[in-house]
Amino acid sequence: MEISSAGPVGAQPLLMVPRRPGYGTMGKPIKLLANCFQVEIPKIDVYLYEVDIKPDKCPRRVNREVVDSMVQHFKVTIFGDRRPVYDGKRSLYTANPLPVATTGVDLDVTLPGEGGKDRPFKVSIKFVSRVSWHLLHEVLTGRTLPEPLEPDKPISTNPVHAVDVVLRHLPSMKYTPVGRSFFSAPEGYDHPLGGGREVWFGFHQSVRPAMWKMMLNIDVSATAFYKAQPVIQFMCEVLDIHNIDEQPRPLTDSHRVKFTKEIKGLKVEVTHCGTMRRKYRVCNVTRRPASHQTFPLQLENGQTVERTVAQYFREKYNLQLKYPHLPCLQVGQEQKHTYLPLEVCNIVAGQRCIKKLTDNQTSTMIKATARSAPDRQEEISRLVRSANYDADPFVQEFQFKVRDEMAHVTGRVLPAPMLQYGGRNRTVATPSHGVWDMRGKQFHTGVEIKMWAIACFATQRQCREEILKGFTDQLRKISKDAGMPIQGQPCFCKYAQGADSVGPMFRHLKNTYSGLQLIIVILPGKTPVYAEVKRAGDTLLGMATQCVQVKNVIKTSPQTLSNLCLKINVKLGGINNILVPHQRPSVFQQPVIFLGADVTHPPAGDGKKPSIAAVVGSMDAHPSRYCATVRVQRPRQEIIQDLASMVRELLIQFYKSTRFKPTRIIFYRDGVSEGQFRQVLYYELLAIREACISLEKDYQPGITYIVVQKRHHTRLFCADRTERVGRSGNIPAGTTVDTDITHPYEFDFYLCSHAGIQGTSRPSHYHVLWDDNCFTADELQLLTYQLCHTYVRCTRSVSIPAPAYYAHLVAFRARYHLVDKEHDSAEGSHVSGQSNGRDPQALAKAVQIHQDTLRTMYFA
């Protein structure tokens, strides 16, 4: 794939994505199955038409109905036996040309509307171009490179898009599409999530070019939908009201606000007009009940009078409201004052929930959807058999054949790196199945903790003093064994309550105890105190804090205490372990910096909050210590706006820490989807170069830019059941695939670096978009796998390289720094970080880390 910016063609050099340098050979071969199904495509040209539908603001579902009706209606004159496929927007493909003039043709189509009224549409169809699947074969076999992709060239002319539309046409008519997945209403199963939401199961389907062939990627998927039910019931679920008839009083303000937040933006249909089930979108909930909410009603004589909603429904529909004390829904446009009593409305079926799930809903969702690998494999196979693609008339029209067995792939299990610990006996740990153990080992570099404090935000009743004493004794014992001795008793140990007491207490500690190294904070479950502790510690005062849930203080376990020590040692400047130096790839022979970058976006439907960009960089040769930079930027912007200055900061810090200038920069970029590769690479690669040149005009280290993706639907299964690992029967940690299901000629690979605990492991996908350092496949795959073993929070290999993981933690922590005490009700379950009326400067300042914290791994 070529990269070009959106400027005029030729104004900027085209960035050519590197070709695959060869295949990896390291590791023990393993036979795998992938949830990819081969699609045989004929070597023909297909015909692309542009479809223009007026009115043009219709949802795709309506557009599809219009086009479907048009094909039926104009069968004799235009379409004959042809079965066109349509993408729901502007593109229509046919296997044979249509008899329409080059200028196009305008057609009138009507759909039956609600309540017997017809809905008229005007449709124009115009020939655009032929799309060649000959060429696709040439590209897939690597015989020809595709022509450089011009950024302004429409996706519809892309032959892969045409294949996708053919395979999507029928399911789009039968099911509810969401992104690349299809869902249908639950039949015979019921998975309520609470709060008016439920789980719908469906499947993901996407077409991807692979080596020598096109593959159809099929996976089972699940998402949250709103339950189709009366609005009164929806309200009861949201507000935890068990019996509406026992609520004779109007809603409290807090109840009304909560209900409004949940129902705003949803579609409802009315039930008081017989078969006329008119639909409306909710824009608000009234403050007043139906018995008091008035609106101006125009009488037949032209006079306007004020009527309450309850009166109006009694007079007009002879309907005595059962719940006149409840508020009304305001629907349609705010300024139009259309009010509906709750009791005449139902939630429209098939609305996907895009709002963030609560913690309870998320855990219910995971329980309902987690499948062991063998179960998922079986489910996907069943799905493909029942989809019966070869019987799909549109698939037949374009002469496709879809195989119904999974692709056989040979992967390799890479060897795990050994990890060097410290202490007198300098033990080495060898991971087995992605896990190792710290028992009998001491940190590579342990910190001695001489001055420390405890602040307990749980009540004295929850956590008595002797419980605290027991906890600190246990912690000191474990920490001594780990080579991080905590000396003596804490210099300060007090109970406190509420987020407001955090600042004053921390200030007192900072001023009273010079040389204080750590504050251990005990929290009573989910609480706004956490955000305030991190805001005060990380940004205002520069003090190291370690939070512990009170349940883990009351009931200590060696595992929990040991995990606490892993975090504390690193926050105070220690090193837990390092990769054994002699087995590291050759890239370590010269100074190299590893960068990890991520952008986290606010939850859907939250227009006000900024996106947060984080970049971390390694600060030593192991690499074990990292330094962080973080910025706020425009909501939903994927490109890291301020990357040049962030990388510059990290390069300066690297030089201060090591006295070397890196000769290589390895950049792991998380969270970019395929559609954004081009513009993100173009902007960010130049930003990294700019950072280097701003330090010295001839400083040009080699840059390798790798995108890490976890959000994809490729799953790998062991073909041989004896190779399955663990209770959930997954592929072993270290499984790598770079053939068959990967890109025809670009440098990408799948690596499952972690041991699956629950459900089916998802391998991470790595795509090299730039490589000045000329890595071989083996070198880069091994380097990536080794970096997955350097994550300090646990003694297991994680699913993405440590620098990418740390960037994610830094961005996530910044959300807490943005929680504004004055404006936010920082409800435990939702880190809000609202930018309520705060200007960009204030937001930027809120995420700025204190000078004393900047050099530490405060995010661990």
From Swiss-Prot:
What GO molecular function terms would the record report?
endoribonuclease activity, cleaving miRNA-paired mRNA; metal ion binding; miRNA binding; RNA endonuclease activity; single-stranded RNA binding
- Segments forming domain PAZ: 230-349
Q: Which reaction does it catalyse?
A: Endonucleolytic cleavage to 5'-phosphomonoester
Q: Name one Pfam family in it.
A: ArgoN
Report the EC number(s), separated by commas if there are several.
Answer: 3.1.26.n2
- Establish whether keyword Transferase is in the entry: no
The UniProt record gives the binding positions of a divalent metal cation as D598, E638, D670, H808
PROSITE patterns per the UniProt record, alphabetical: PAZ, PIWI
Q: Taxonomically, which superkingdom? A: Eukaryota
What keywords tag this UniProt record? Cytoplasm, Endonuclease, Hydrolase, Metal-binding, Nuclease, Ribonucleoprotein, RNA-binding, RNA-mediated gene silencing, Translation regulation
Where would you say this protein principally sits, based on its record? Answer: cytoplasm
Q: Where are the transmembrane segments?
A: none
* Top-level class of the enzyme under EC nomenclature: hydrolase
* Start and end residues of each Piwi domain: 518-819
What's any GO biological process attached to this entry?
mRNA catabolic process
Location within or outside the cell: Cytoplasm, P-body
Region annotated Interaction with guide RNA, chain positions: 530-567, 758-805
- Annotated Gene Ontology cellular component terms: cytoplasm; cytoplasmic ribonucleoprotein granule; nucleus; P-body; RISC complex
Protein's job = Required for RNA-mediated gene silencing (RNAi). Binds to short RNAs such as microRNAs (miRNAs) and represses the translation of mRNAs which are complementary to them. Possesses RNA slicer activity but only on select RNAs bearing 5'- and 3'-flanking sequences to the region of guide-target complementarity.
Which HAMAP family does this one have? AGO3 (MF_03032)
Q: Which family does it belong to?
A: Belongs to the argonaute family. Ago subfamily.
Q: Return the protein name.
A: Protein argonaute-3
Native organism = Gallus gallus
